[in-house]
Regions:
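Extracellular/periplasm-exposed beta-strand and loop segments of Gram-negative cell-envelope proteins
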Residues: 71-83, 117-150, 179-212
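Outer-envelope beta-barrel architecture signal
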Residues: 56-64, 102-108, 150, 166-170, ...
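Bacterial Sec-dependent N-terminal signal peptides
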Residues: 1-24, 161, 249
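Sec-dependent signal peptide cleavage junction
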Residues: 16-62
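Outer-membrane beta-barrel proteins
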Residues: 39, 43-54, 92-99, 162-166, ...
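Glycine- and aromatic-enriched membrane insertion/assembly motifs of diderm outer-membrane
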Residues: 59-134
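Predominantly the C-terminal beta-signal and adjacent terminal strand-loop region
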Residues: 71, 197-249
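Residues on the lipid-exposed face of transmembrane beta-strands in outer-membrane beta-barrel proteins
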Residues: 64-68, 88-96, 110-114, 154-162, ...
């Protein structure tokens, strides 16, 4: 009788212990993965929730943007041609920081930016005279005529990126440009001779700021960049702005 009583008490104790165990929430966290086992009264069945928490991520990346410059606000005499005006942006290095568990990324980069604003072939070219960039005619009977304003400098893109889905992200932010070099070109043929004349120290603005937006789909991007600041300093050349449309990788 005593043995039966002891066996009954033992069985009751084991049952109570099992029920107590079912009300216990077990949390294991390994390598950024949290696994929660919950078998309490809220759910009569067995339930396992797996929550993936990405750790803080910092990546070093490189980017290239190639686009067409669309000039706006230029004086009527300056007829810039879109497909003679190009923009190449090479971000040599960019640090991209994603906070823990976030879908936003903050980036700062360092790179080079070359811009070219080419005129239509209407018989005039860009020249520098008396410390001012203006227009002058090409020599008579000149062929293969081309003239442009070009700048080259160091830029610092500061971008905020929002991941919209697994494959799509949107980026926006300012780009600070340090325009170290600038020149105007006149290229033409005359008889059997080819001429290429470059004039430097044209009075470009040393620092400008652009605003850029990017739509990226699986690493293939389309960007739009607006340049609200003038290319030349005041009274050093024609005043104009530009919008750039292109591809970004």
């Amino acid at each position: 009788m005593k043995k039966l009583l002891m066996m009954a008490l033992l069985a009751v104790g084991m049952t109570a212990n099992a029920e107590g165990t079912n009300d216990f929430t077990n949390v294991n966290e390994t390598n950024g993965v949290t696994i929660t086992d919950d078998n309490g009264d809220k759910d009569k069945g067995s339930k396992t929730d797996i929550v993936l928490k990405e750790g803080e991520c910092g990546n070093w990346t490189m980017h290239v943007g190639i686009g067409v410059n669309l000039v706006t606000g230029a004086p009527d005499a300056y007829e810039f041609a879109p497909f003679k005006s190009w923009d190449i942006q090479f971000t040599v290095v960019s640090y991209d920081y994603t906070p823990k568990g976030a879908s936003q990324t903050y980036s700062i980069g360092l790179g080079l930016n070359w811009r070219n604003y080419g005129l239509k072939d209407n018989g005039t070219s860009l020249v520098k005279a008396n410390n001012l960039v203006g227009l002058a005619p090409f020599p008579a009977n000149a062929g293969s005529r081309y003239s442009s304003v070009q700048t080259l400098g160091i830029n610092i893109p500061l971008l905020f990126t929002q991941k919209v889905s697994k494959s799509v992200s949107l980026s926006v932010g300012p780009i600070v440009n340090f325009n170290a070099w600038g020149w105007v070109n006149r290229d033409y043929e005359l008889g059997d001779d080819d001429y290429s004349i470059s004039t430097r120290k044209i009075g470009q603005r040393p620092v400008t700021v652009d605003v850029m937006g990017i739509v990226d789909i699986d690493g293939f991007g389309i960007f739009c960049k607006y340049s609200p600041m003038k290319v030349f300093k005041k009274d050093r050349g024609p005043e104009f702005n530009s919008v750039t449309l292109g591809l970004y990788f």
